[in-house]
Amino acid sequence: MITKQQGEVDNVSLYETDFVKWAEEQAALLTERRFDLLDLENLIEEVDDLAGRHRDALQSHLRVIMIHMLKLVYSTGSRNPEHAWKRSIRNARKAIRRLIDNYPSLSAYLEPLSERAYKYATEDAHDELSDYGDDHESFPTSCPWTLDELVHHEFWPR
């Protein structure tokens, strides 16, 4: 029989050496309701990280939409792949809808994440436009589109 202290030591070392096996064992312990043997410290950290990963994914999709919308509006080059930018926007919009459908509480993060995403999007759009020979110096200081416009499947910037 595994003692509580032995289980704690095994859990911690397993967490560091074989995460998948650690996770499977934690799930089994939860299923068996053997809560006293759980690696609570790492389990709490992992559960918290799960929520963070979904927020990060949401911000990343918003950033992609903003980058390509900025490029659609500000690109003056004749070599720009507008169709690819639009496809990327459509894919990111679908991904956001799936995230919100699966995790409705994420919708509360759209506004604050969009503000942060815009900062990174302007930096990335500037770099990417330079790759196409567009030397655009600056973008609006705040996002020129509403959240509804960013995620609506029929909206395209002009």
Segments predicted by a language model, with ranges:
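Surface/interface-facing alpha-helical segments and adjacent flexible terminal/loop regions used
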Residues: M1-R158
